[in-house]
Amino acid sequence: MAAPLKRLLLAEPHVVALGHRVGRREASLGPDPGAPVRVRFAPSPTGFLHLGGLRTALYNYIFAKKHQGSFILRLEDTDQSRLVPGAAESIEDMLEWAGIPPDESPRRGGPAGPYCQSQRLALYAQATEALLRSGAAYPCFCLPQRLELLKKEALRSRQTPRYDNRCRNLSQAQVAQKLAVDPKPAIRFRLEEAVPAFQDLVYGWTQHEVASVEGDPVILKSDGFPTYHLACVVDDHHMSISHVLRGSEWLVSTSKHLLLYQALGWQPPRFAHLPLLLNRDGSKLSKRQGDIFLEHFAATGFLPEALLDIITNCGSGFAENQMGRTLPELITQFDLTRITCHSALLDLEKLPEFNRLHLRRLVSSETQRPQLVEKLQGLVKEAFGSELQNKDVLDPAYMERILLLRQGHISRLQDLVSPVYSYLWTRPAVHRSELGASSENVDVIAKRLLGLLERPGLSLTQDVLNRELKKLSEGLEGAKHSSVMKLLRMALSGQLQGPPVAEMMVSLGPKEVRERIQKVLSS
């Protein structure tokens, strides 16, 4: 333990104000209305970013951008034993992938850094010293074994476990005696009865008399690392956070945080607690559900725009729910006062439809389409590799034609490399015996189709082909139009089902259609 802190533990506390004490009414008003909006997303890198975290980050981001403010990423990495390798980097990667990058962060830096709590220990020590000096905090020498016994006894009696404040009123002599044995005690904060009420921007006027239901909380552990309660207050103050938008699970802790603000003489920010994001059946999103992590969605072809759309569509904060909103539209339409206290129920079965809408919008965009072409090229190479007999299928113009023809029919780019679309990239091995028609009819139909392809001045659009293909069965005994289309679909794709034959032909182009028909005839 640092020498100044040890001296404070041995000194008689002086109950003095560290600044002006924040009154009950002041605590509800928060920062100066003219102050710049600064919000933060403060995840713990003990895991990777999931949909619940994305929603909290998104609400902070769009609130900041709507008010020309700053969005800050702060990593709460004080629980060193639970850190997951790579999680810190992945969290920031996923925010950038989602299109909501922070203005200040561990990676980007900024005027209020550092942005990892493990690098801000001196600030927490300073705040702890101030609280010890004023008598608002005290050392706790209770062993983990004793605390565990308290917990077990409470549970046995069907009571909520709480610390019994045993070390709260130790004399100076007792503190000195215990410091000789345990020079690194934990530091606890004295909970007071008079908790300031505060006006939550979602839940309204709120007050929790925490001292009546909780023991004094640890704010600084014996290893010098703070707990969440101290760290978030100190960081929000020093980072000039104007509004705290966080999950509703922290609502009951806010009174505790206001007591800390009051003891330190600091002005608290405004608070807005967001209702939980739940599964469609009302159950909690579980981190054990592997498919709720953003990396899963990114790897399986879902667009960030679709995720942002669905997690706002199922909740509140907007005048109406509608599918297909873009991020600029979310920023424009967002209204914090419209967030209700009701949990948001997320139906992930609808995500493919959301993705379909946003993929269609991107395909229709002249500026966005080249990026989709590049991604599709990578998917085709990965899926088919050496099976690609014709490298022309990787040509950007061909890829673009496929995207434009299939827009609205596919939910993800990955759909285009599924077995049903394999004919776009590889030539099927089809024998004429598989076509389900007499050999004579096959020859006639093939000859007519090849003649159609050679007809001068004929523009082979889908509309023209749909009209001309109806004529292929004319005069053929027992040959219906539907059976002819089935034959051609098999010849071109090796499949019984798929897109309309006219679209297949436009997709493949006259040269490839001719080669496939001739290949079947010669088999």
UniProtKB/Swiss-Prot annotation:
Transit peptide start-stop: 1-41
Binding site for ATP: 50, 249, 284-288
GO biological process: glutamyl-tRNA aminoacylation; tRNA aminoacylation for mitochondrial protein translation
Modification N6-acetyllysine occurs at: 486
E.C. numbers: 6.1.1.24, 6.1.1.17
Gene3D superfamilies: 1.10.10.350, HUPs
Motif annotated as 'HIGH' region, chain positions: 45-53
Main location: mitochondrion
InterPro entries assigned: aa-tRNA-synth_I_cd-bd (IPR045462), aa-tRNA-synth_I_codon-bd_sub2 (IPR020751), aa-tRNA-synth_I_CS (IPR001412), aa_tRNA-synth_I_cd-bd_sf (IPR008925), Glu-tRNA-ligase_bac/mito (IPR004527), Glu/Gln-tRNA-synth (IPR000924), Glu/Gln-tRNA-synth_Ib_cat-dom (IPR020058), GluQ/Sye (IPR049940)
Protein role: Non-discriminating glutamyl-tRNA synthetase that catalyzes aminoacylation of both mitochondrial tRNA(Glu) and tRNA(Gln) and participates in RNA aminoacylation for mitochondrial protein translation. Attachs glutamate to tRNA(Glu) or tRNA(Gln) in a two-step reaction: glutamate is first activated by ATP to form Glu-AMP and then transferred to the acceptor end of tRNA(Glu) or tRNA(Gln). In vitro, cytoplasmic tRNA(Gln) is slightly glutamylated, but with low activity.
Name of the protein this chain belongs to: Nondiscriminating glutamyl-tRNA synthetase EARS2, mitochondrial
Annotated source species: Mus musculus
Taxonomic path: Eukaryota, Metazoa, Chordata, Craniata, Vertebrata
Name of the encoding gene: Ears2
